[in-house]
A protein has these predicted regions:
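Class I S-adenosyl-L-methionine-dependent methyltransferase catalytic core
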Residues: 1-169
Length: 169
């Protein structure tokens, strides 16, 4: 790992503590939505670990997933993966997107649609494509399904070369 990446990880250590309660896990249903768009990607890296269900879900869907019980900002990232797919902690969405662009790999990250209105994301507009689910997504927390999300989310994609920049499911 080069010094720039080490520096990024050190800068994120204090930020990472802020998302202690921001650990909602993606359901298998949500991951299934992505399958048509990741046919050529078999080794997935999800740097955020909740209860480990995501790794199991990806394996059930025929994909290999690197998702270990380690803090995403306190470690070196694996190099042998095809794509990053993650339901990131929304409280640190800007820092996550910066990190993922730094890793120079394709990614799909789940974030609120409202993030498109944030000033910081405008520098990425030309690089991003969106996959917008047909309904509000529900997440699990501590292994239990939530009551439902009160906001809309979408998948922010980079490096997938989708046929359209915005895909509505």
């Amino acid at each position: 790992m080069d010094n720039n990446k080490n520096h990024m990880i050190l800068n994120f250590k204090t930020t990472a503590k802020k998302f202690k309660d921001d650990d909602y896990e993606t359901t298998k249903e949500i991951l299934e939505m992505l399958l048509p768009y990741i046919k050529n990607f078999n080794k997935i890296y999800d740097p955020f670990y909740c209860n480990g269900a995501v790794k199991k879900y990806w394996e059930e869907l025929g994909k290999k997933c690197y998702n270990e019980k380690l803090d995403a900002f306190d470690r070196e990232h694996p190099e042998d993966f095809d794509i990053i797919i993650s339901n990131i902690p929304f409280t640190i969405k800007q820092k996550c997107m910066e990190l993922f662009f730094e890793l120079k790999k394709p990614f799909i990250i789940l974030m609120p649609i409202a993030a498109m209105g944030a000033k910081w994301i405008s520098k990425y507009f030309e690089k991003l494509q969106l996959i917008i689910p047909h309904k509000r997504l529900n997440f699990s927390k501590n292994g239990k399904m939530g009551a439902g999300s009160w906001f809309d989310t979408c998948f922010y994609c980079y490096g997938l070369n989708l046929k359209k920049d915005i895909i509505k499911l």
